[in-house]
């Protein structure tokens, strides 16, 4: 059903979002990844990455020293500068730890397409060291089910993407906020 060219709220879409979140929570075998980056313009690189498990335990948390410029707008959001990251390891040094944390788990990310694009660019830059990346499970996006859960119509059809509620623009804070969001959806609240 459409009203003024906008798709109306669909209870089935909300129910599907709740079912997706419940499947995650009931399995307990997933992790949430979040990152902060150098900005939106290429090249884009990680400056901070965090992974939490279904119990909100921090599996990985760390900053990353990029080898490209950090956009001023990104710094205003997450606070990282080239100077503050000077002592951080480059991506290739933390990559084995990230693989271990993500291996054989469902990986959930808020706005997964963006983080996965940055991940894929980072892994490609590793050359042969990145060959195992193709073995990771696909990443699941929490933003899309949450948009359907909220049910706010988009002018382009479907549902309007929502900002991550309660995120603080740190990788760990946003990973925990995404986990809480999944738990909230699973409860149907």
Regions found by a protein language model. Name each.
Residues 35-43:
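Short acidic, Gly/Ser-rich segments with clustered Asp/Glu that frequently serve as metal-coordination loops
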Residues 17, 70, 91-94:
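Amphipathic coiled-coil/heptad-repeat helices and related helical stalk/stem segments
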Residues 9-11, 23, 27-30, 42-48, ...:
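Metal-dependent phosphoesterase core characteristic of DEDDh/y 3'-5' exonuclease domains
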Residues 76-97:
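Metal-dependent phosphoesterase signature
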Residues 1-24:
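Short glycine- and acidic-rich boundary segments immediately preceding or forming the N-terminal edge
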Residues 12, 85-92, 169-172:
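Conserved phosphate-coordination/catalytic loops
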